[in-house]
Amino acid sequence: ELEPLNYLPDWNKIDPQVLKDTKLIYLTYPNNPTGSTATQSVFDEAVQRFKDTDTKIVHDFAYSAFGFDDKNPSILASEHGKDVAIEIFSLSKGYNMSGFRVGFAVGNKDMIQALKKYQTHTNAGMFGALQDAATYALNNYDDFLIQQNETFRRRRDTFEAKLKEAKLPFVHTKGGIYSWLRTPPGYNSEQFETFLLQEKSILVAPGIPFGKNGNHYVRISLALDDKQLEEATERLTDLANMYNG
């Protein structure tokens, strides 16, 4: 039930009994789909609140390489972070290895052991060449991650500047690879998705699958080449009268 413009958890708004009964909390920053990011203090608060309980935390750090305004913090850098949390990393985004399904988790040893046990019973293993490629990427391509981040930051800046100029309402993307655009008056997310596809040949993701508060937003990927993104931006800004008319 998170709301713009920060999309950060407020534990005080959750029923204490619900928190007491909660076994697992799943956080993801930079956030998909909203593009919001967390500060270290957000993780500090979460760890301090749950470190003496039976509740554990999983932080999905798939978009760790993409932090445009500040460096993305790790929950494991919080005091006692490793006592209560694990962090999940993916090579799909930062290293352009989508489809290879390569990732890893670090953190709380008991959670890692449980994950290892589950993995042993559900997965026969990964093709060795993919593991070798992933290992090589991790050991040799830190500079590439910097370039990736700069590429997406530039796309974000250009895209948002055009939306702002046309007075289209959006949530400022602080990290990740998506933009979170509000729908025009009279449209929910699925209706606007259909409209954009049929009338503008633009494919977006409706916000409703991400929760009911996403019903008046659509997710737009910045993972396009500059020419495609420029064309899509022009088609979107042509709709300014739908928002401002």
Predicted regions and their residues:
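Helix C-cap/helix->beta junction micro-motif
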Residues: D52-T53, A166, K200, Y243
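Residue-level recognition of strand-loop junctions within catalytic nucleotide-signaling folds
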Residues: N108-K109, N139, R182-P184, A223-D225
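Conserved core segment of the aminotransferase class I/II
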Residues: S78, K82-R153, D157, A161, ...
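PLP-dependent enzyme catalytic core of the Aspartate aminotransferase-like
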Residues: D15, G186, F195-V204, F210-G245
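Conserved glycine-rich beta-strand-loop-beta hairpin in the small C-terminal domain of fold type I
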Residues: T135, T151-E160, F170-R182, G214
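A short linear hydrophobic-aromatic micro-motif
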Residues: A166-F170, L203-I208
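Active-site phosphate-binding strand-loop segment of PLP-dependent enzymes
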Residues: E3-N72
